[in-house]
């Protein structure tokens, strides 16, 4: 898999390119008895050391870039690695099936659950089909339909958040985008079953919140959660998107900062270099946290779940 190095990772990319070149030469030179294994190993150790150094001191803007990484695992990747027996459910039973939201029945360690999440695309056609992970009202209404189904059958709900925001097109507004988001916020706060939400990439504004009201809210180490994108904030405050790095630092969009503010419960560590470097490792860590959360919430009655969720929402903004 191509790692698609970001701008701040270019020193690592240069080392990796040298490693690839030497490895190719070594393979071709086997017939000539040329052995470059020691040099390749030295460069690999240097690359690892450099990666550790760079990732030990990332700024908010660099983390925002990682949250948007084109190879970052999406909802369907986690469904494939964490769950079994996934059966996708489609449509909002009112207008259409929005491909920017996926969801359905699945099992985690044999336990039935309802899984719902934003889904971006990787290739151009898939990105367009998924609308770049920006749901329309029918996407949020589909999500709510699945949540209400889960409540009827007493199934825990697990959501994965990864969107730049709700789709702002004219058609979406005409079909009631703000109403769909507001309804989800209200209804999720009343659900009588456990709800566990995890930000796996971008957590963009109301588009993220519409499936983000939970008993437990987790964030991956290099994910972000904010009311507006850094570029959008910079355009408003400084009239220039070039100030996005400054805006990202000021907005407090990173997982550690949001945990300090008690807006999220757990920050899940990612593999060195980010989740895109090792799908298996990040899926294992995420699954372990989901199982911990489920076990904790299992001890609560439906009334306790709703009351705790209400108190959680009411204390936002007070630290």
Swiss-Prot record:
EC number(s) given by UniProt: 2.1.3.15
InterPro entries: Acetyl_CoA_COase_a_su, ClpP/crotonase-like_dom_sf, COA_CT_C
GO molecular function: acetyl-CoA carboxylase activity; ATP binding; carboxyl- or carbamoyltransferase activity
Entry-linked Gene3D superfamilies: 2-enoyl-CoA Hydratase, Chain A, domain 1
Cellular compartment(s): Cytoplasm
GO cellular component: acetyl-CoA carboxylase complex
Domain CoA carboxyltransferase C-terminal stretches: 35-296
Top EC class, one word: transferase
Reaction(s) catalysed (UniProt annotation): N(6)-carboxybiotinyl-L-lysyl-[protein] + acetyl-CoA = N(6)-biotinyl-L-lysyl-[protein] + malonyl-CoA
Pathway: Lipid metabolism; malonyl-CoA biosynthesis; malonyl-CoA from acetyl-CoA: step 1/1
Record's keyword terms, sorted: ATP-binding, Cytoplasm, Fatty acid biosynthesis, Fatty acid metabolism, Lipid biosynthesis, Lipid metabolism, Nucleotide-binding, Transferase
Entry's Gene Ontology BP terms: fatty acid biosynthetic process; malonyl-CoA biosynthetic process
Family classification: Belongs to the AccA family.
Its biological purpose: Component of the acetyl coenzyme A carboxylase (ACC) complex. First, biotin carboxylase catalyzes the carboxylation of biotin on its carrier protein (BCCP) and then the CO(2) group is transferred by the carboxyltransferase to acetyl-CoA to form malonyl-CoA.
PANTHER family: ACETYL-COENZYME A CARBOXYLASE CARBOXYL TRANSFERASE SUBUNIT ALPHA, ACETYL-COENZYME A CARBOXYLASE CARBOXYL TRANSFERASE SUBUNIT ALPHA, CHLOROPLASTIC
Subunit structure: Acetyl-CoA carboxylase is a heterohexamer composed of biotin carboxyl carrier protein (AccB), biotin carboxylase (AccC) and two subunits each of ACCase subunit alpha (AccA) and ACCase subunit beta (AccD).
Protein's UniProt name: Acetyl-coenzyme A carboxylase carboxyl transferase subunit alpha
Organism encoding this protein: Photorhabdus laumondii subsp. laumondii (strain DSM 15139 / CIP 105565 / TT01) (Photorhabdus luminescens subsp. laumondii)
Gene: accA
């Amino acid at each position: 898999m191509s790692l698609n190095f970001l701008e701040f990772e270019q020193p690592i990319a240069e080392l990796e390119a040298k490693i690839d070149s030497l490895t190719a030469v070594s393979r071709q030179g086997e017939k000539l008895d040329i052995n470059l294994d020691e040099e390749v190993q030295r460069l690999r150790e240097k690359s690892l050391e450099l990666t550790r150094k760079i990732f030990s001191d990332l700024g908010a803007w660099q983390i925002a870039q990682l949250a948007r990484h084109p190879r970052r695992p999406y909802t369907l990747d986690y469904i494939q690695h964490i769950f079994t027996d996934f059966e996708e459910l489609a449509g909002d039973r009112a207008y259409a099936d929005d491909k920017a939201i996926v969801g359905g029945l699945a099992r985690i360690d044999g336990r039935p659950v309802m899984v719902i999440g934003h889904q971006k695309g990787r290739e151009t056609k898939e990105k367009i089909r998924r609308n770049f992970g920006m749901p329309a009202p029918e996407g949020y209404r589909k999500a709510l339909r699945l949540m209400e189904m889960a409540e009827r059958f007493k199934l825990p709900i697990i959501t994965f958040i990864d969107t730049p925001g709700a789709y702002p097109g004219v058609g979406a507004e005409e079909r009631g985008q703000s109403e769909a988001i507001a309804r989800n916020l209200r209804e999720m706060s009343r659900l009588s079953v456990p709800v566990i939400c995890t930000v796996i990439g971008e957590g963009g504004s109301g588009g993220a919140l519409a499936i983000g009201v939970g008993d437990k809210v987790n964030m991956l180490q290099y994910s972000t959660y904010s009311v507006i994108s850094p570029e959008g904030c910079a355009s408003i405050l400084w009239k220039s998107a070039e100030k996005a790095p400054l805006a990202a630092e000021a907005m407090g969009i990173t997982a550690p900062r949001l945990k300090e503010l008690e807006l999220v419960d757990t920050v899940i560590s990612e593999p060195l270099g980010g989740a895109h470097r090792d799908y298996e490792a990040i899926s294992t860590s995420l699954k372990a946290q989901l199982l911990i959360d489920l076990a904790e919430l299992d001890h609560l009655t439906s009334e306790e779940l709703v009351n705790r969720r209400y108190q959680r929402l009411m204390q936002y903004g007070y630290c």
